[in-house]
UniProtKB/Swiss-Prot annotation:
This is Histone H3-like centromeric protein CENH3. GO terms for biological process: cell division; centromere complex assembly; double fertilization forming a zygote and endosperm; meiotic cell cycle; meiotic chromosome separation. It comes from Arabidopsis thaliana. The gene is CENH3. Changing G21A: In strain: cv. Be-0, cv. Kl-0, cv. Tac-0 and cv. Wassilewskija. The C-terminal histone fold domain is sufficient to direct CENH3 to centromeres. Residues 16-36 have a biased composition (Low complexity). The modification N6-acetyllysine is found at K63.
Amino acid sequence: MARTKHRVTRSQPRNQTDAAGASSSQAAGPTTTPTRRGGEGGDNTQQTNPTTSPATGTRRGAKRSRQAMPRGSQKKSYRYRPGTVALKEIRHFQKQTNLLIPAASFIREVRSITHMLAPPQINRWTAEALVALQEAAEDYLVGLFSDSMLCAIHARRVTLMRKDFELARRLGGKGRPW
């Protein structure tokens, strides 16, 4: 193929055999070293360092090396739009029925509160009582978060703030007010 001053734009090949043939025919020039006779090498052409075209001043060769590789080997990592993963997690956790607070840390906290508030003789809990207490605590927290979210939406915000929790506790009559 003769060198021309202006580069001809070509349409993309339809299948991979055309892509390999088109990249080798485009690559025949000063930037490649063919290993077969006549420059018909398909996959056996060797790329050298990309050079700068004197007419346009653009780099050639880097784009060709990307086109020569099969498309299946370059896996682009998919990035979800902001908020999609959060909604997916919300749906996932709403479907679950198990407890979300780790049992060991919850039991440790219950024992420390019992040690601070109860007399020294009372320091033992049955397993059923701890499970019931954990279920009640998680139910209370879920209700508090949902009421707080309603307060934030009422204030035309999406972000939960401390004042939303305070207002939800005051309006719900749960717990002591600040």
